[in-house]
Amino acid sequence: MASVLDPVCRHAAATPDNIALRGGADQWTYRQLRDTSVRYAGALAAAGLSPGDRVLLAAPSVPEFVVAYLGIQAAGCVVVPVNTMSTRAEAEYVLGDAGCALAIAWHALGHAVAEAAATLNVPSWTLSPGATVTGAAHAPVVDRDRDETAAILYTSGTTGRPKGAQLTVGNLLSAGEIGAECSSGSSADRTGTGLPLFHVFGQASVMMATLTVGGSMSLLARFDPASMLEMLRRDRLTIMAGVPTMWNAMLHVAGDADPADFAGLRVAVSGGASLPGEIARAFEARFGCTILEGYGLTETTAFGTFNDIDRGGKTGYTGRAVPRLQVQVRDIDGNECPPGTVGEVHIKGPTVMRGYWNRPADTAAVISPDGWFRTGDLGATDTDGDLRIVDRIKDLIIRGGYNVYPGEVEAVLYEHPDIIEAAVIGVPDDHYGEEVAALVAARPGSELGAAEVSSWTRERLSAYKVPRIIRFVDALPKGPSGKILKRSIDRTELTRAPRSATYPRCGTEHPPTGEMCPPQK
């Protein structure tokens, strides 16, 4: 029997005055975090909630999110964190699908959650600064089996309606232990992030890992590169966690910042999307730390592989399986692929979700009877066992019978000094089935044009991988974690767009599907 609150209770007893949370000028000790969380649990129990009841939580990355989250856990209830930008319809869907008994929303948010709750006759609370609740009293922490559901995180819903991934007590506790081990974390560490805690990366890799070792966690309610840089200086961070777009943004505001301001920073943990080598090298050089990339999903409580902190990162790779997990790359027949061969990534271990909420068929489609989870991601290992994520299976572009992995093309685009954001997608094409399209955000003041982008990629990629459609944008759409959202890109206009270059077929040397030659001179 266990509770997600256990690490906090342990440190509150051993080192009660150590700082657990920082949010701007606010600080919370481990004693304060435990006591306030337990009082919050008492208020939930007094309101009639029972263990197993689902509670929706909508709040930014503020200390009060952590209090409410842990209070829900201490009461034995199931937390259902949602995006703070959720519309009324989106909140209503989650409330109904999860069968929530209560909705809690941060005081500064709009009325979407409260209105959705009222529509379904679900009571709603306001989460106020300090996480004060009326009629609150200390209540005993409810222990549960490690395989009981502790949280339901709804996936992004790239196809169909979002599905709720059930993360168990054991999943979350294991994630905290694994995350702490991967970063060699200790109670002396000061971790900072601009990630949303309602996302699995912030929740499992950062929050749970920090609380597991008794370190402190500094939070930004909303990521801003200048604010993140100031937090790094002010709180003397030793660990940062974020996604590639955050590192890129910080590089652009670092300017002539004094390296002494971040002399204590030892590691930056990167995830959520592939980390371009150019960004990794530039960040390490500017901030004097090691940047380590990991790989995981909501359904694996954020963990799968991670670059070993003792041997450093390997550019383009997300490392080996983390402790206690197994990772395999398998072919279409389910056989393990040899090094260098692309296949689907499978993960097994204590962080694999219990299943999708009320969706047994969807669960059976991704979790085998012996516990292996099909990620839907394409990857390959090298001879050292390090994993390279190639792309999502659904993002694969098949142009004239040839596989084009968007991530490979994006990596080449990011090498260009004037490109700060890039996304490569496939669009329907009458001749080749799909055509390669690149959306590019250039550095302010740059005179970069499509011809130069085309030339840059032609020099570095096989002809069939070169984008024939190139569009410039001010910025690419991003999700709450900062990850670029390809599903939000309007493909309609791109489908009608003229191709920027044409390439003759290769005569008798091309296969039936039509290999492409380099341009004729």
Predicted segments, located by residue:
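AMP-binding/adenylate-forming catalytic core of the ANL superfamily
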Residues: 86, 103, 348-349, 354-355, ...
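Conserved AMP-binding A3 loop
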Residues: 29-31, 150-174
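Conserved pre-ATP/AMP-binding loop-to-beta segment of ANL
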Residues: 17, 137-154, 161, 184-190
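Conserved AMP-binding/adenylation subdomain of ANL enzymes
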Residues: 173-190, 198-239, 253-254
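Gly/Ser/Thr-rich phosphate-binding loop
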Residues: 237-242, 252-313, 326
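ANL superfamily adenylate-forming
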Residues: 25, 108-147, 161-162, 253-254, ...
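Conserved AMP-binding/adenylate-forming core of the ANL superfamily
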Residues: 17-62, 66-70, 87-92
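Conserved ATP/PPi-binding loop(s) of AMP-dependent carboxylate-activating enzymes
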Residues: 320-324, 335-366, 404
